[in-house]
């Protein structure tokens, strides 16, 4: 599962470092009989605005190791449990609607985001509480990693 690119991945997969992941992928794909890289992403409030970067990384990863076939479509999954604080249903509809505008979005990701809109239970406090708990246990600060639209909403700075 690759749930973001660069600093977004480092935030979600703390204490991992992005370079360590890419080095590990280099080593893995240098082995024989590895033909088609496939990437899965759990879509959450933490990475919903990183879909374009994930798409670019997926395409780069694929062409870097297998130039004979087009890149496989990204596989997106829901966060489990579905009522977790970072679940898409807890974001406001306007943010989810903005997330649908990303150019790299797949039908699968679009469906998950649309489910977040259709089943929306916007809950600012629940999202913020989970993120602050993560930050506290990891000595991180979401402001340094997450998309500015999410940060603005978390801080009540809706534009």
Which residue ranges define each predicted feature?
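Radical SAM/AdoMet-radical enzyme domain recognition
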Residues: 1-90, 95
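Active-site rim elements
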Residues: 9-14, 38-42, 99-100, 113-117, ...
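Extended, charge-rich low-complexity interaction segments
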Residues: 70-80, 99-113
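Radical SAM enzyme core and accessory elements
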Residues: 102-159
């Amino acid at each position: 599962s690759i749930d973001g690119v660069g600093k977004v991945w480092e935030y979600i997969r703390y204490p991992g470092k992005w370079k360590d992941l890419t080095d590990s992928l280099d080593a893995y794909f240098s082995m024989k009989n590895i033909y088609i890289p496939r990437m899965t992403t759990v879509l959450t409030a933490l990475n919903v605005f990183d879909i374009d970067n994930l798409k670019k990384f997926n395409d780069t990863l694929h062409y870097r190791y297998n130039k004979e076939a087009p890149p496989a479509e990204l596989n997106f999954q829901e966060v489990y449990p579905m009522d977790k604080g970072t679940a898409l249903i807890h974001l406001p509809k306007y943010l989810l609607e903005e997330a649908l505008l990303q150019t790299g979005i797949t039908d699968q990701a679009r469906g998950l985001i649309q489910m977040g809109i259709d089943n929306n239970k916007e809950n600012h406090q629940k999202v913020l509480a989970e993120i602050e708990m993560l930050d506290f246990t990891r000595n991180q600060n979401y402001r340094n990693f997450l998309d500015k639209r999410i940060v603005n909403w978390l801080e009540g700075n809706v534009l």
